[in-house]
Amino acid sequence: MSWLHPTDKHLLFTKNDKEDPRLGECVQLLPKDDLGNLSNYDYDFAILGYPDDEGIGLNGGRVGAQVAPREIRTPLYKMTPHLHSTTLPKILDLGDLDKEKPLAERHEKGREIIASIAQSGKRWVSFGGGHDYGYCDSTGFAQTFPGEAVVINFDAHMDVRPTDKGLNSGTPFFRLLSEFSGQVDFAEVGIQNQCNSQFHVTWAKSKGAQIFTLDDINSHGLLATLQNYLKDKKSKKIFLSVDIDAFTSNEAPGCSQSWTTGLFTKEFLEALQWILKNHDVRGMGIYEVSPPLDSDKRTSKLAALLSHGFIFGNLNKA
């Protein structure tokens, strides 16, 4: 079987105007069954979709995120390059991970793909799907950079539920911290008081996690919080995990669990650009965008905007 399904070529938007280039013109599509030949492609950024919300359903959430990868690619590939960019990105779209095999096998294959990208020195953006796929991204990253990996999770929820009741969208960082205990720096940012149990917070802290609640962010600012956390991590590699429910429901209504409280786009983009300019950020995953629950495609466009910021923040730095 093929583990990846190629992205629809019709998503590669173009105005057919050399004076108005779009990101869709910067994308190569990985052909089916060519996953083993990634080293043959010339690219700066890989994009991978996880069209799978089984883990959300298993955690009692509202499903719909399985259609997110396509709905995020659509506005992303219509965007223009950044106004301050002097070069165009070379993007390799790997397509979407197959979801016919059992969930655990899908997670392991996703992890294998991410590790392959990370080991090649390339950067990536992934689109969920449930946040259980944060396991694929974070562990594929951590195994590639043992002892120098930093994972920052922007989220309303801890997502450190134990796996004794099975895998689901609440378990990715329980798995990461259990498997890579003492080998990865891990921070949770934007944690909301009404969304988490004290048991989960205590467990994460026992594994070395740094926790910054939404109250902390509101008191000190997102940028200042991240600057302080990263001040002694200049030499390390970073992966950013973004559960879209970290944002307010006004800005990201299309997700399984949204609240009126949360992060704001403006502050996040400011912090993202600072991190990209000052640190080595290898990848970013965006999870739990649920287009059936969205309003005017706001949440899909937010995810696309964050991806655009990641791509050009890295490209302009170079």
Residue ranges and their predicted role:
Residues 2-318:
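Conserved alpha-helical scaffold segments that buttress catalytic/binding sites
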